């Protein structure tokens, strides 16, 4: 798991619970999308998008 995603999940219990409910394949896709980003701002955007989705905001 990317460090930025792990930190964001640790800081947000609702998103962390959403992460735990996800199937392994979905978790892997979120992690891959973040890891594959070349620019730091892209990684940050993808982490924010994943957290919002896990919170049920998108």
What role is predicted for each listed range?
Residues 1-58:
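Charge-dense, helix-prone N-terminal extensions
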